[in-house]
Structures are given as structure tokens and as C-alpha cells.
Amino acid sequence: MDVETWRHYFRVAKSYGINHYRFHSWCPPEACFEAADIEGIYLQAELPFWGWMGKDNTRLISYLREEGLRIQQEYGHHASFVMFALGNELSGDFEVMQSLVDTFRQADRRHLYAYGSNNYLGFKAGFGRTPGMETIVVD
């Protein structure tokens, strides 16, 4: 979609009182950020991941780290980019998640960071705010 199409959707959303868009397990394109900047919409980008994060999966962790840094480099300057999450309904090793969030926060302190959206659904141990997270996303 182009900037004007995104602007149309954001204006409709605003007419219903919506001011925040979460992009489930993906990052929207440049046109979306440009339109959101113009229309005053807050955006939450996410890494393209949904599942278990473990220390042993070094290839995955490396990919997510590199992808997150690329997303920040490409879109982080937009005023509409207010939140960044590691993915959707994640579970796994808190240390791995904390390491990724720390890396992203050090690269760009302008955003709010979360380990993920709707994390640890059905798992009592991970319920609620976790140290190192600045926001909790549940929808």
C-alpha cells in the first residue's frame, strides 16, 4: 500500500478512537510509518517470531538480533515507531529475551520494548511484568 492508502485506514481508525496499531509478528513498510507520522498513530513493530526462544538456538537468536537492528536502523527515526516487541506469544529463556531487548535498547532508546505480545499464555511462571520490560502488550 502507498502512503495515502495507509493514511485512509488510519483516519478511519482514528474516527473510532483508535490511536495504536500492533503489527503481529512483522514490521510494516516505510509507507505505513510515513502515514502514521502524518496522522498521529502509534505503531508497534514486532520481530517475525512466534514460539520458544532457547539459548541453544544460536542461529535463530542471531537472526532475530540482526533483523531487529535492521528494523531499528530503517524505521527507528519515525515518531510513530513507539513500541518494539520480540514477537508474539513467546516463551522460553528470559535471559535470551533480556539480551535481545538490551541490545535493541542500547541501539535506540527512543522506543518502549517488550519481550513480546501475549507472552507465556497459559504458563503461570511468566505471567505479568518481567524485569527489563518497559511495557506489557496483551490484546
Indicate residue ranges for each PLM-predicted region.
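N-terminal carbohydrate-binding accessory modules
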Residues: 1-13, 34
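A conserved hydrophobic secondary-structure block that centers on an alpha-helix together
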Residues: 10, 15-22
